[in-house]
């Protein structure tokens, strides 16, 4: 998956400095958040981007936002749950498999010294 091949939303400040970027893909009535990057935490860019992609998804007839993150990404897990996402699935060993077959450069140890092994899927229902 190359996020550059998908629609993107930008968050900018009043002086048009880039604060964040979100890429997404709509498939039927589901919208997947592919990437979300905020230049700085706690400035509202991530929240603004999630709110905007939800509006885009609803306008496109989607009923659900969803995404996948890794087991070490505790900051993302906190953020998404605070935004109404719920844990929907655990994919044990998914990162291990990707490291072995697709991307050997994936590190063994992730954020906060946590072994990087699994993927977690989060979902949020949206109102059409």
Protein language model features and the residues they cover:
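Conserved functional loop/turn residues at catalytic and ligand-binding sites
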Residues: 37, 53-54, 61, 84
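Conserved acetyl-CoA-binding loop-helix of GNAT-fold acetyltransferases
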Residues: 43-57, 74, 78-82
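Conserved GNAT acetyl-CoA-binding A-motif
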Residues: 57-69
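Conserved beta-strand-loop-alpha-helix junction that forms the acyl-donor binding cleft
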Residues: 67-76, 88, 92-99
């Amino acid at each position: 998956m190359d996020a550059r091949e998908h629609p993107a939303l930008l968050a900018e400040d009043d002086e048009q400095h880039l604060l964040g970027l979100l890429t997404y893909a709509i498939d039927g009535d589901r919208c997947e958040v592919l990437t979300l990057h905020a230049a700085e935490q706690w400035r509202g860019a991530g929240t603004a981007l999630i709110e905007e992609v939800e509006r885009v998804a609803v306008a496109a007839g989607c009923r659900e936002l969803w995404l996948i993150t890794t087991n070490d990404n505790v900051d993302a897990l906190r953020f998404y749950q605070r935004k109404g996402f719920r844990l929907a699935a655990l994919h044990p060993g998914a990162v291990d498999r990707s490291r072995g077959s697709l991307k050997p450069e994936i590190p063994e140890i992730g954020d906060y010294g946590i072994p990087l092994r699994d993927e977690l899927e989060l979902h949020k229902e949206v109102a059409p």
